[in-house]
Amino acid sequence: TKYVWPKYSQVIVRDYVSGAMENTTATIHGEFLQQHSRDLLDENYEDVISHELFHQWFGDLVTTESWSNIPLNESFATYGEYLWREYKYGRDDADHAGLNDLNTYLDEAGYKQVDLIRFNYDTREDMFDSHSYAKGGRVLHMLRKYLGDEAFFAGLKKYLEDNKFSSVEMHNLRLAFEAVTGEDLNWFFNQWFF
């Protein structure tokens, strides 16, 4: 799905309280993101940039109907990091980053076991964890491998087109993939998302 907004800006803010925020058409970043060419030798923040850019589709064009479904936004933005790396640096680099994401999730899973989509939480901040980000991105990759690239990306396009400018829940994503593949995917979504 093409970018629908008239522009896109990235704004660096001093003393910003968060890493980044994906406002529609203008992502706010902390000043850590502003780097000189020599800084890039040590570390770059392409993952943050690609993550926030993917939110223009997954979070802004289509958003969630509740905090319980926030993994729809964050899982896709995290998987966007993988897709960017795969495009720019190749599959090996992307797979290495995916392995890092998996380990990040597994570290958290050592003391916290919850479903990706969960309706019982103390505060909405509880939803912004490695389950929603790292595990969600890995589950999307697993779904891509199961369906194949053609069906996976056709399903994403259908999901975005059918739901643009609206709020959704996880079942909307499942229905888009089912419409494209003709396959009942309840088993996959029930096992990995709920």
Where are the predicted features?
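Hydrophobic alpha-helical and helix-loop surface patches within well-folded domains
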Residues: T1-F194
